Amino acid sequence: TVKEGAAAAGLGRRSLIKRSLGAALGLVGLTPLLLLRDLGPLPKDDFSKTSWEAGTRLVTDPGDRPIKPSDLEIGAVAQVLPELPNGKVRKLEDIGKDAVLLIRIRPEEFQLDAERLSWTHEGIIAFSKICSHMGCAVALYEQQTKHLLCPCHQSTFDVTRAAKVIFGPSARPLPQLALALDSDGYLVAKQPFTEPVGPSFWERDSA
């Protein structure tokens, strides 16, 4: 079943972050994600193109299990990746670009405009895990304040306000991934990211 698969992948209720103290998210086996520049050159054109497309299912990382809204309780946060086509092998550089944080709060806690609110689903919101300052992994979540924190330079983002920067050197919010449900009730991307993923200091074309 879906819940059995989710539990096996580490997305079961006991494994989700439910305490108010920040905790590291999904970093086991992903140490290179902490500073993406250590992976080697990441040209702007390659970095800005992620694997997310309209209709791509969100899957657990680790585990590659598709996710339904019922798998996430209020206060939960999980790292997810785009589902791979059959036979395709996930590359480390793709994980660096594609990693997303999935967070569930009470819908009434959002302070979003109509468009951004339409990108959420029943209190579930998704952001790129890659800090928009220097490309580190945003790895801490404080449940009471609904803040995400990058441990490298302490950039802090408000989940309720579309990951608006409220502290630290980052110049822009974390890109938000629009969510929807497919015909089987699994969470999918409504569309690709509408803004570049990754550090602001790299110049990119807006297209």
What residue spans do the PLM features occupy?
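N-terminal pre-ligand scaffold of iron-sulfur
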Residues: 1, 38-130, 136-141, 181-207
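N-terminal secretory signal peptides
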Residues: 1-10
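N-terminal twin-arginine translocation
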Residues: 9-47
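Short cysteine-rich clusters marking metal-coordination/redox-active sites
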Residues: 131, 150
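Short Cys/His-rich metal-coordination motifs, predominantly Zn2+-binding knuckles/fingers
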Residues: 134, 153
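Short linker/helix segments within small regulatory modules
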Residues: 142-145, 169-170
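Active-site signature of cysteine proteases
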Residues: 145-147, 154, 161
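Short Fe-S-cluster ligation motifs
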Residues: 158-196
